[in-house]
Amino acid sequence: MKSINLFSIIGLVAILSLWFVSCEKDSDTEKPVINLIEPEEGDILQIGSDVHFEMELSDNVMLGSYKVEIHSNFDNHDHGTKADDAETAFFFERSWDVSGKKNADIHHHEIVIPENSIPGDYHLMVYCTDAAGNEAHVVCNVILSHEGGEDHDHDHEHED
């Protein structure tokens, strides 16, 4: 009799535990939002200069990190499928931590295009991952050139 009561109690606890776990809030499945402000589609980025990079990130729960990648688009590939590896004249990839925030206003000049970079069409890609691992990305077509580009005369102070 005691063993029947013990098994009944264990069974009841197991059922209640499963019910409690199944009633927890759904996990975060919403991707973060990327609003790339600078550079804009088709901008000319000057070789030998830094890039004025500005964007706004937001997430419904919590941001995690973002990554910027710049690579050549000499073969006019797209990012719908994996393209063959093309010779990359200039390549940049770096990640930044933005964890602990729901919103982040990003502004920096940490991307520098070396003097020996080959001019041409490039993809600037921004990836943002939230704390739950959901990822969003945007692609911006830019042109690297020895002439033209930004003069960096915009309304903010630079830190030395």
State where each predicted segment sits.
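First exposed extracellular module after export/assembly in secreted or surface-exposed proteins
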Residues: K31-D160
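Bacterial N-terminal signal peptides that target proteins for export
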Residues: M1-I10
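C-terminal motif of bacterial Sec signal peptides marking the signal peptidase cleavage site
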Residues: L18-S22
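Bacterial signal peptide processing site
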Residues: E24-S27
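Alpha-helical transmembrane segments
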Residues: V13-S17
